[in-house]
């Protein structure tokens, strides 16, 4: 079972860049691991650090600003997660501590991979995202509330509605990843297997 996602309130960091691709999110040289943990240390590695080994933080990159330490909601621009298909991208984001990414649009494969890893991609209009960037920049350290049950983002004194398809919403609300969905049918699977001839088991 994955962690259930119903509502999250968190610090917002504004990444004011469009077409952020998966190689920027987690560069290819860090993809050797086969577990989901440890990728957060290399999130946005080429932007966060001045050296390849990730020892010298780049003071001009927004994730390194003191006021955004501990951020769990990433505010981004259009076509977030484009580029090559790698599930390591949402792994890196969640391992770093992100629960939500808000953007005007997402690359299709990244969008699907996010749900599989309990990272909520929230799509709002360009105008709404512009408003949120202005709000965050005027109020560094502001927190947003993201309510998946009600499908709204509460930011300052405004509320923004978003839409998630019913199946993905159900899975996140109930903490169901691909394994969890399969286990919901465990009894039926076992019954089917028991009906098979011995030579087929």
Swiss-Prot record:
It catalyses: (2R,3S)-3-isopropylmalate = (2S)-2-isopropylmalate. Its EC number is 4.2.1.33. It comes from the Bacteria. It holds the Pfam family Aconitase_C. GO terms for biological process: L-leucine biosynthetic process. Pathway: Amino-acid biosynthesis; L-leucine biosynthesis; L-leucine from 3-methyl-2-oxobutanoate: step 2/4. GO terms for cellular component: 3-isopropylmalate dehydratase complex. It is an enzyme of class 4 (lyase). Catalyzes the isomerization between 2-isopropylmalate and 3-isopropylmalate, via the formation of 2-isopropylmaleate. HAMAP family: LeuD_type1. Belongs to the LeuD family. LeuD type 1 subfamily. This is 3-isopropylmalate dehydratase small subunit 1. It comes from Salmonella typhimurium (strain LT2 / SGSC1412 / ATCC 700720).
